[in-house]
């Protein structure tokens, strides 16, 4: 399992610990990932995703998983999330027609 958010694409970042004497040692900044179950209202189904805490706040801000995925850029999404987005857009188009 990779250390990457499935919705925002946040991954591990690298930097330095810097001491008072200005000694630098390499370190990793890990994303705050949570395993969550999100429900798609359009598809009437729940999905288990590994997302960052900030992405979870963004999902709630945009009114749920469907609203977030429709507005999200495909480059940031994981392959699973892109597939889910296509299904949601297709189902919304069917309901509108």
From Swiss-Prot:
<protein>
    <recommendedName>
        <fullName>Large ribosomal subunit protein bL28</fullName>
    </recommendedName>
</protein>
<keyword id="KW-0689">Ribosomal protein</keyword>
<dbReference type="GO" id="GO:0006412">
    <property type="term" value="P:translation"/>
</dbReference>
<dbReference type="InterPro" id="IPR037147">
    <property type="entry name" value="Ribosomal_bL28_sf"/>
</dbReference>
<dbReference type="GO" id="GO:0022625">
    <property type="term" value="C:cytosolic large ribosomal subunit"/>
</dbReference>
<keyword id="KW-0687">Ribonucleoprotein</keyword>
<comment type="similarity">
    <text>Belongs to the bacterial ribosomal protein bL28 family.</text>
</comment>
<dbReference type="Pfam" id="PF00830">
    <property type="entry name" value="Ribosomal_L28"/>
</dbReference>
<dbReference type="InterPro" id="IPR001383">
    <property type="entry name" value="Ribosomal_bL28_bact-type"/>
</dbReference>
<dbReference type="InterPro" id="IPR026569">
    <property type="entry name" value="Ribosomal_bL28"/>
</dbReference>
<dbReference type="InterPro" id="IPR034704">
    <property type="entry name" value="Ribosomal_bL28/bL31-like_sf"/>
</dbReference>
<dbReference type="GO" id="GO:0003735">
    <property type="term" value="F:structural constituent of ribosome"/>
</dbReference>
